[in-house]
Amino acid sequence: MADRAHRLKKRAEFLKVASRGRKVPSPGLVLQALGRDDSDPARIGFTVTKKVGNAVVRNRTRRRLREAVRVVEREEPLNGVDLVLIGRDGTRGRTFAALVGDLRRTLRKAGVRGAE
C-alpha cells in the first residue's frame, strides 16, 4: 500500500472485486475482498458515496480509511488480495481506533492472510 501502484483505479477492477469477492460489513466501513493467485502486495481501492456527504467530507473519510490501512499494514503486510473499502456514514463519527478495529475485524472475517 506504500505506493500508488498498489491501488485499484479502474471501474472494471472495482466491479470484479464486488462481484466475485467476499463482502464484510461493519459499523465503520464495508470491506470487499478477492484473493489472487500471487503473493504480490495487496491492491486496495477506496470509495465513498455521495450519501456520506459533500466532497470535503468524502475526501476526509477516504483519507481516514487510507491511514487505517497503513496502520494495519505496518503490523503485517497484506499480500495476494484485492480489497475495496467502502466508507459509510458511520465512518465519519467513529474514532480512529474504532475504525482501525473495524478494519482488522473485517479483514479477519474475510480470511485475508496477514490480518490474523
Curated annotation (Swiss-Prot):
One of its GO terms (biological process) is tRNA 5'-leader removal. GO terms for cellular component: ribonuclease P complex. Keywords: Endonuclease, Hydrolase, Nuclease, RNA-binding, tRNA processing. SUPFAM superfamilies: Ribosomal protein S5 domain 2-like (SSF54211). It is an enzyme of class 3 (hydrolase). It comes from the Bacteria. Its EC number is 3.1.26.5. InterPro entries: Ribosomal_Su5_D2-typ_SF, Ribsml_uS5_D2-typ_fold_subgr, RNase_P. GO terms for molecular function: 3'-tRNA processing endoribonuclease activity; ribonuclease P activity; tRNA binding. It catalyses: Endonucleolytic cleavage of RNA, removing 5'-extranucleotides from tRNA precursor. Pfam families: Ribonuclease_P. RNaseP catalyzes the removal of the 5'-leader sequence from pre-tRNA to produce the mature 5'-terminus. It can also cleave other RNA substrates such as 4.5S RNA. The protein component plays an auxiliary but essential role in vivo by binding to the 5'-leader sequence and broadening the substrate specificity of the ribozyme. Consists of a catalytic RNA component (M1 or rnpB) and a protein subunit. Belongs to the RnpA family. This is Ribonuclease P protein component. It comes from Gluconacetobacter diazotrophicus (strain ATCC 49037 / DSM 5601 / CCUG 37298 / CIP 103539 / LMG 7603 / PAl5). The lineage of its organism: Bacteria, Pseudomonadati, Pseudomonadota, Alphaproteobacteria, Acetobacterales. The gene is rnpA.
